[in-house]
């Protein structure tokens, strides 16, 4: 704080006299930053945001099913909503309104029912197969959690299986579905006994499927499941499942609806966005975000805001699901937008401010997830910028600014991976970045995500806060991307012991990373000084100096955007769904495999299973443990099959390469109770995996070391 104030004081001393500003021609008069923010805040109308969200969530014409809603990728309802949103953008005065068509797989849930002994039970589908119009009438079989072990001695061929599922503690619906198909079942119904849909015992839940269309797959309420299960011990129970679910591969179109406020220059732009496709009614997720984005646009227009750069408002389709037979089947509309429709937005977009569920008070605090390079920007805006709004009537502990890495669960990650600085309001994870907020256990992706969850104080704060953030980024002459955060990220990714075991050059890696710090610090100082001088000029009313500083900032903006794109292209990886530095995947796998070997050498398979086996390959070995090899073959083909590499979306070119330990994982689990057993075969598999992972580690470190050297030059 002292350094910031010192810079500001020096800038004030260096400013030309205020008299010169007073004598400037009238044509050059400019609104002060305070007046811009005051005008926006006065015009920001949370009730307008609510009205948009309410209509999107309750208008039956904007949903595919009158009973349970749903506005899926490429569906009639999604197209109707796109038309409505484009019309609303034009009505409030945005220019260049467009429905940008993007490819997707089409999913339209028209309806479903499940009848047992004359009683109909509500069900809701995933992006999976339909039944024939007359439905499937077959015996119902309960198979526990739906693992391969639950089918032992059970004949389910041609039958409807009923399972319990906890998609947070155990696995996604994909795996019980594929197991049921592998075992010959005709359809599967899943009751959420934990993880999601806990708000009520009749709650239904839908998610992306991360798999093929497979067999008809539906969510059923826990109470309904219990009623049906109670009948099973008394003899064969027949059920009739009818599913009208359109899933068309390669035949869908989703629309990303955009409008803009033209800036004084169109060289750069700022993007505000949310998504309008939904599971069920989707009031919070993500109708409220759409309302917020349009309310921000309307407030800027109504306040007479004239931005320096274009402000683009983009409402994405196909966020919840958009493609079959891929692990990365969500945020498809956004991925297509930045990679196919507008790749030129990379290097042009100063920031993408994304929104998810922005009208719910998740905790006593709020956060913003972002690229690490944006941590300083968010911290300085929140704690130092005099016009940053504070929460009123919500979030009593304020806005936390410790820095929270954006994750893969929202549209901003597709932009981030492509090279666009991106943020999203803190909507999912608690501040430990491990546990989710209770909303996700209870309401998320259920029919209970309705206007009853609305909190106007939260909507009003998020509208004012992020609208002010957009204005701040627009007005500052230099974009405050801080590559000392990238330095910290790379430094913290080093495990010197694993490097040494693998023959990777830890000293060289450390040296190159350390060489990144001085130019990163110097660039940060240049940016901070320029922006501080701009604030001082604004305070003094010196519009001539402000114009000069803005011109001086343009080369810095180009520099940091180029460096940011470079960082994500060469230094961002994914381990399943977790953002990493690429070498962290083999580094982590080596350590885990060595722990497992140590346990097996001690004849202690129980500890190996309890602590390590399931965590290899991020979490994928937990699936290998519980599901048939044929199921895992499908998982592997979706992620690493040569014929599916053009179907990975935000995982393209950054997905990790898994260790081949499935057979050993399954074997150790099945032998976990053995005492004094011979695990030589399993140990050999893990040792072979370590040898392969060491090669991967050396290759990754070599690439990263070279890339960091080039990054240093880009920052200098």
Task: Report residues per predicted region.
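Soluble metallo-hydrolase cores and metallopeptidase-like ectodomains found primarily
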Residues: 35-37, 119-153, 207-283, 294-306
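Noncatalytic luminal/extracellular "stalk/propeptide" segments of secretory-pathway proteins
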Residues: 47, 54, 58-160
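C-terminal non-catalytic alpha-helical accessory regions
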Residues: 464-465, 473-716
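Active-site-adjacent substrate-binding region
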Residues: 252, 358-488
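Bacterial Sec-dependent signal peptides at the C-terminal "C-region" and cleavage site
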Residues: 15-25
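Second-shell loop/turn segments in exported
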Residues: 36-44, 62-76, 142, 164-177, ...
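Acidic/histidine-rich catalytic neighborhood of metal-dependent amide-processing enzymes
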Residues: 168-175, 179, 256, 278-375
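Extracellular/luminal Protease-associated
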Residues: 75, 124-216, 401
